[in-house]
């Protein structure tokens, strides 16, 4: 667990960790490309290593080093054992689709307790539309999942756009194997679109083209058939989701910090954290590849639509605790479908510290109190809650004890060390 105490000042230069979203998609794309690919600056986090493990099970040769991964991709093979993807929902969803293209037999995909609670039925239903047989072993729409090898026999699939963009990413990465051109048709308005923009961006670098469909009565994506993934050398950019904790720390504390490896023109939706803190009153400096912050700033509450930025909700919740007036988070129903119900967890745990938070069906209303008190907090082994609650603890009176700190290895393995390097008063016990 983490012991967090009030921190008076933070100062220094800190690199944002590599992007989890980009690393997942790049290692899987490289594994599907026939030949040698090099991934520079990959995220050596547990979730991305789960994707690398799954790709090995499906035939890729992967060497993981700290600063680069070497991948020799080849044709998919039948896995010789169950594919255990640990705690990685992204891996589960993408590999479920991809594994349908093994030459014969079956693939079985499962993970830890948390993964075996994550919804999969919308993806299984979509694969069925394409002629692919896949099912939950317990007939309850969650892992373990069994996928049968099979050709794609339909050129159109309909799926909701408001549950998980990972389902759509899985289809995007699988449909290039089809013999014919295909369409993904969205039956509801799309949420988390920036994650699909990341998918399209990565696939483009590996030679796979996807077009967006925007018509009066149809929204979705068009994927040409018989496409081949091509090997390449690819550099992973920094992760704005993880950088949000560094940025919020600088905004709320007496600070002089520079966050490097975050790009002004990134396709990541979570780059919105810059605009959010600016609208709240923080005069941060954004450059081509870094953000400079000299806090603290006097913040004011604002209304924030989190349709496309679900991973920022825990960070926003903490910022709202120290803003004047009300901070309203809305359009966040899908935030309940992450590693845990993050809306409920933020409301319950921050309230223990004295925060004034009202939970709504699609979001939160946070009334700034400017004062929190240390408490013992549960995180449901959710990495984003651990990091957000750490910020709250540094601004609270007394001592804050945060359970489940091991989960940060998923997206920000050296979170504690980097935070301590700029002066944060935190310890692992």
From Swiss-Prot:
Pfam families: EPSP_synthase. Belongs to the EPSP synthase family. This is 3-phosphoshikimate 1-carboxyvinyltransferase. Keywords: Amino-acid biosynthesis, Aromatic amino acid biosynthesis, Cytoplasm, Transferase. Pathway: Metabolic intermediate biosynthesis; chorismate biosynthesis. Gene3D superfamilies: Enolpyruvate transferase domain. One of its GO terms (cellular component) is cytoplasm. GO terms for biological process: amino acid biosynthetic process; aromatic amino acid family biosynthetic process; chorismate biosynthetic process. It is an enzyme of class 2 (transferase). It catalyses: 3-phosphoshikimate + phosphoenolpyruvate = 5-O-(1-carboxyvinyl)-3-phosphoshikimate + phosphate. The active site is at residue 311. It comes from Methanococcus vannielii (strain ATCC 35089 / DSM 1224 / JCM 13029 / OCM 148 / SB). Phosphoenolpyruvate binds at residues 20, 89, 118, 166, 342, 384. Monomer. Catalyzes the transfer of the enolpyruvyl moiety of phosphoenolpyruvate (PEP) to the 5-hydroxyl of shikimate-3-phosphate (S3P) to produce enolpyruvyl shikimate-3-phosphate and inorganic phosphate. It is found in: Cytoplasm. PANTHER family: AROM/DEHYDROQUINATE SYNTHASE (PTHR21090), PENTAFUNCTIONAL AROM POLYPEPTIDE (PTHR21090:SF5). NCBIfam families: aroA.
């Amino acid at each position: 667990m983490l012991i967090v105490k009030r921190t008076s000042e933070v100062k220094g230069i800190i690199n944002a960790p590599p992007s989890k979203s980009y690393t997942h998609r790049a290692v899987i794309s490289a594994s599907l490309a026939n030949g040698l690919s090099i991934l520079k600056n990959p995220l050596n986090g547990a979730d991305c290593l789960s994707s690398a493990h799954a790709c090995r099970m499906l035939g890729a040769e992967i060497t993981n080093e700290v600063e680069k991964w070497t991948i020799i991709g080849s044709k998919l093979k039948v896995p010789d054992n169950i594919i255990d993807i640990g705690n990685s929902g992204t891996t589960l969803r993408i590999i479920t689709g991809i594994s349908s293209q093994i030459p014969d037999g079956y693939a079985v995909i499962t993970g830890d307790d948390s993964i075996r609670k994550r919804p999969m039925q919308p993806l299984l239903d979509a694969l069925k539309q394409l002629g692919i047989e896949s099912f939950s072993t317990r007939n309850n729409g969650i892992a373990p999942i069994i996928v049968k090898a099979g050709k794609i026999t339909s050129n159109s699939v309909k799926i909701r756009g408001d549950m998980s963009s990972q389902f759509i990413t899985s289809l995007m990465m699988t449909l290039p194997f089809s013999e014919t051109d295909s369409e993904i048709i969205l039956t509801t308005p799309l949420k988390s679109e920036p994650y699909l923009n990341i998918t399209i961006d990565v696939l483009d670098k590996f030679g796979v083209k996807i077009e967006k469909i925007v018509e009066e009565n149809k929204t979705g994506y068009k994927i040409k058939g018989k496409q081949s993934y091509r090997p390449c050398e690819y550099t992973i950019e920094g992760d704005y989701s993880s950088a949000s904790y560094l940025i919020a720390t600088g905004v709320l504390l007496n600070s002089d910090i520079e966050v490097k490896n975050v790009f002004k023109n990134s396709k990541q939706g979570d780059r919105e954290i810059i605009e959010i803190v600016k609208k709240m009153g923080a005069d941060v400096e954004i450059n081509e590849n870094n953000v400079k912050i000299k806090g603290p700033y006097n913040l004011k509450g604002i209304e924030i639509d989190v349709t496309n930025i679900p991973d920022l909700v825990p960070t926003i919740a903490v910022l709202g605790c120290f803003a004047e007036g009300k901070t309203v988070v809305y359009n966040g129903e899908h935030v309940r479908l992450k590693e845990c119900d993050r809306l409920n967890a933020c409301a319950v745990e921050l309230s223990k510290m004295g925060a004034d938070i009202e939970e709504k069906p699609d979001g939160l209303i946070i009334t700034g109190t400017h004062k929190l008190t240390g408490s013992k907090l549960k995180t449901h082994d959710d990495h984003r809650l651990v990091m957000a609650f750490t910020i709250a603890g540094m601004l609270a009176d007394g001592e804050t004890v945060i359970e489940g700190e091991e989960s940060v290895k998923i997206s920000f393995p050296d979170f504690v060390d980097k935070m301590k390097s700029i002066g944060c008063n935190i310890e692992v016990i």
